[in-house]
Amino acid sequence: MVEDVAIVGYLPGEAGRYIADLVRAHVPAVPVRRPHITFMPGRPPALPDAELLRRLRQRAQNFLPLELTLGEVRNFLPLSPVLYLDVVAGMAGLDQLRRVLLEATENSHPERFPFHPHLTLAYDQSPEEILALQPRLQAGWAKYPGPRRLRFTQLMLVRQTGPASWQDLGSAAMPGME
């Protein structure tokens, strides 16, 4: 069985650490993955990993770092029991990046849900648990003292290795990476 591949951007610095700690404190039953924004959701690969990574690195050279702003804690109910931080600014750059990523990976698989950029906070919970968690996570996020506008300088190709498990396959730097 071939596992899905996806392209993500890990949250940089203090924001990533804060969100991981926030999730760990309020959703201990769910394994905490490294906080990230998904730029291309998981789908079966159309090309070998080495070729996907080569193309990703080649295309990333044409992009400036992506600046996205995180908003409030929201949920996808009733469609899906997921809590997330909304991406509220930076969509034009993200849409352009997504088009290039889809072309570069030669992937025409339809997405399960319409693409809505976000940072997942909680999943695999009942709708009631999601609704109970939402105000607590929002209160915790409201206390974050840092900037909500984050600069992404790297793309990461990842492979799904289990139901909630992903492995980094390689990164691609966008210009301006330190």
Question: What are these language model-derived features?
Answer:
Residues 153-162:
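Short beta-strand segments and strand-loop junctions that repeat across beta-rich extracellular domains
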Residues 150:
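Short, surface-exposed ligand- or partner-binding patches at beta-edge/loop junctions that are enriched
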Residues 1-69, 75, 87-146, 163-178:
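Basic, often amphipathic N-terminal segments
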Residues 74-84:
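Short, basic/glycine-rich phosphate-binding loops at helix/coil junctions
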Residues 85-87, 157:
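Short beta-strand element of the conserved SAM-dependent methyltransferase core
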